[in-house]
């Protein structure tokens, strides 16, 4: 599969990788229907979601692991497309997929992905929801709801121009840091929406 790289090709039971500084770690599971939607697919989504979770803590994402849970009858062609999408997105995000696993369960051809991500946080950088204060500005990176609307449209076979904004946000975060923006807290807004994120900030601070 095109997802392979030097570390994966060693086929060891664990990946030994270089690193320094403080570690940031995250894990996530991805179940989306349909597997392919305007602007992305479950493979791209799994890499972006994991990378962005690391970025939200101020980390520089470095390594990912990937576990596929396949229902019996899963389409091998679709699996290859998903793996290729993951490899491409990982390259764009500057991360390396260093370990993986596959399990097959009873079912009707579904494909699910679990990931773990590791990044390194620069010394002295602290980004936490507890740092939020009354009067802070809240910035959003784009139009809210496009991603879920694109998936729903594909699922319900509704024709429109809505495209998921699924993407690694590293460049955006680095641009703000280089511009001197004082970032207190960040979140990758997912199913809970902006309201849930703001509630989390309020409770934490």
Pin down the residues of each PLM region:
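Helix-biased detector of long, well-ordered alpha-helical tracts
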Residues: 1-205
